[in-house]
UniProtKB/Swiss-Prot annotation:
Its EC number is 3.1.-.-. It comes from Anaplasma marginale (strain St. Maries). GO terms for cellular component: cytosol. This is Putative pre-16S rRNA nuclease. One of its GO terms (molecular function) is nuclease activity.
Length: 157
């Protein structure tokens, strides 16, 4: 089910709030997972995309293996806040993910998370090539953590 607000998203979840964070890219996905209280987002992995069918199968396997029933997916809005072509691709993929896995999904503005992830890896002293291997999963963790923090700030969790 696609949730249109943080309130409806967290309202649909049970006590165990393990949530997947997904930074959607054309070539790869960055993945993050929250703890069971839905408080802390941790980078999980980077998945190299193959095709939609295999991508959905792999995500569904991760959801089952990790005991996850919900996902926060980054929505790549343009700088002016408008939706571009990539947003339509993300929305289409999310509908297929919901159909296959039955997860609750909340779409969250992901503007600037990749830049924030790059600055984080730079501050850790990682070289560019090494940082490119982790930037996507750090971006996914940032997207997920932003939503967790917003929910906490609103007294939802």
């Amino acid at each position: 089910m696609l949730c249109d607000s943080i309130e409806s998203f967290f309202g649909a979840l049970g006590a165990d709030r393990r949530i997947l964070g997904l930074d959607f890219g054309e070539k790869k996905f960055g993945l993050a997972v929250s703890d069971s209280t839905g408080t802390i987002a941790m980078p999980h992995s980077v998945y190299l995309r193959r095709n939609v069918r295999q991508d959905l199968g792999e995500l569904n396997a991760i959801l089952k293996r990790e005991g996850i029933c919900a996902a926060v997916v980054g929505l790549p809005l343009q700088l002016d806040g408008m939706e571009g072509e990539m947003c339509a691709v993300v929305r289409s993929f999310v509908q297929k993910l919901i159909k296959k896995s039955g997860v609750y999904v909340y779409l969250h503005d992901e503007r600037f998370t990749t830049a924030m992830a790059s600055r984080t890896t730079e501050s850790l002293g990682l070289r560019r090539k090494a940082s490119q291997k982790v930037d996507d999963k750090i971006s996914a963790a940032l997207i997920l953590q932003q939503v967790l923090d917003m929910a906490k700030g609103r007294g939802i969790i």
